[in-house]
Amino acid sequence: MHSHHSHSGDYSAHGTDPLDSVVDQVVNLNFHTYCLTEHIPRIEAKFIYPEEQSLGKNPEEVITKLETSFKNFMSHAQEIKTRYADRPDVRTKFIIGMEIESCDMAHIEYAKRLMKENNDILKFCVGSVHHVNGIPIDFDQQQWYNSLHSFNDNLKHFLLSYFQSQYEMLINIKPLVVGHFDLYKLFLPNDMLVNQKSGNCNEETGVPVASLDVISEWPEIYDAVVRNLQFIDSYGGAIEINTSALRKRLEEPYPSKTLCNLVKKHCGSRFVLSDDAHGVAQVGVCYDKVKKYIVDVLQLEYICYLEESQSPENLLTVKRLPISQFVNDPFWANI
């Protein structure tokens, strides 16, 4: 079993447990591959989260501490990887990466620099979008609304901006794993009224957004998604199926069935699995539910995972695991 995206309380302000405790749980559950991928630091004051304000007396001090924390993560993760590399009683292989912050071009360039300067440790990145129009969309409901308000409460324009930001991240970074592809749905209210033609919200002519498939409702959105997936396919990237959406009470993981069908059509059906854990209790979270999603709903023939070569360069390759082997993995006996 695999997870390609994880965090801990040591290096994330919204994490809950030490990295070593998370790793202990990973080993106890008998994962095959587990990727350690803390967030890169945000390097501008306006992107510091409220929970991080207490890290320093001023924004500059907070940013310095975030940068130091990320350096500490790389050292710690390398020690963990080495610790378990030659243990015959542990089958888990740890791969070290990072989750990028694509708030703006400055952060995209910073991510590229981090990867280049630390390529002996960081083997890949999870490419994610957490901000739309510079406003976080996964922090809380009010911030999500603030982002929507910045588009004059037009959901279509909001989504177009999300997928354009994703595209800019993709063409500049070419992340091997693309994270929570439809994160925008986390705080999207099911009962919000949307005009099907214009995308304007809360109009009397609107219908509940839950009754719409927002990807196929507007051709501009559909085309942007297909463009992004075709670009990911062009360099061999993979889309993560992320169970944190199920943990947060959404009906489907990231991405939705509609998007997954487009991945099958335009991106070689390259899916990897992630728990996006931020603590011990979230390791392998909702994997029983996602197994049904993968096998019964998506009817995938295989699931992909990353494997690190034993060459001097330690390059990563995307491997395929047939679904028949996936459903019979020893991991399932432990959850």
UniProtKB/Swiss-Prot annotation:
This is Histidinol-phosphatase. It comes from Saccharomyces cerevisiae (strain ATCC 204508 / S288c). Pathway: Amino-acid biosynthesis; L-histidine biosynthesis; L-histidine from 5-phospho-alpha-D-ribose 1-diphosphate: step 8/9. It is an enzyme of class 3 (hydrolase). PANTHER family: HISTIDINOL PHOSPHATASE-RELATED (PTHR21039), HISTIDINOL-PHOSPHATASE (PTHR21039:SF0). Present with 4280 molecules/cell in log phase SD medium. The keyword Coiled coil does not apply. SUPFAM superfamilies: PHP domain-like. It comes from the Eukaryota. The keyword Hydrolase applies. Belongs to the PHP hydrolase family. HisK subfamily. One of its GO terms (molecular function) is histidinol-phosphatase activity. GO terms for cellular component: cytoplasm.
